[in-house]
């Protein structure tokens, strides 16, 4: 087989926020459909996956904007520090007392609880007067983060991620096409090699 000499010019860019947001979108729609059909078996696991994807997608979107807008962007900076840097750069007041930015902290805390998955041991020893029904409602074996596995928080988190993303993207003056994965290549023939 004859060899040829060519010049390859290639460029690719991958922005993982798209994949994470697509996963969040998938889970969000699946959860809504399942709840509409009263199909609740294992839905909390899908809520956990959805909220995790939303938290990761939001951070990836912030990293994307930081990468595009802020010189020497540090994607390893703390989560909330990065959000504050990007919002400041784009002239947005970061108010974590109200939505949608209140949700950012809740998602960050949720994410941090699950990853890296630190063990928690709690002990309690006391006598109480209660009813059997009250004992069952205590949720003693329920972790704090599990309270966020509910339809309303999933809806709010997904909606707030979209609100934040659309607002920041609009303010950034970047086009939607700037956010997509892509690339290209050209091959230029130089000569035959014997």
Q: What name fits each language-model region?
A:
Residues 1-47, 193-194:
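Charged alpha-helical initiation segments
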Residues 4-9, 58, 79, 105-108:
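Short alpha-helical segments used as structural interaction elements across diverse proteins
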Residues 10-21, 40-51, 55, 97-104, ...:
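Amphipathic, non-membrane alpha-helical segments in soluble helical-bundle scaffolds
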Residues 24-27, 31, 50, 57-61, ...:
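Amphipathic alpha-helices that form helix-helix packing interfaces
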Residues 30, 34-37, 68, 89, ...:
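Surface-exposed polar/charged interaction patches
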Residues 48-85:
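Short, contiguous, well-structured surface segments enriched in hydrophobic/aromatic residues
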Residues 74-97, 105:
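A contiguous binding-surface segment within folded domains or other stable secondary-structure elements
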Residues 94-106, 110-181, 189, 194:
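Charge-enriched, short contiguous segments at helix-coil
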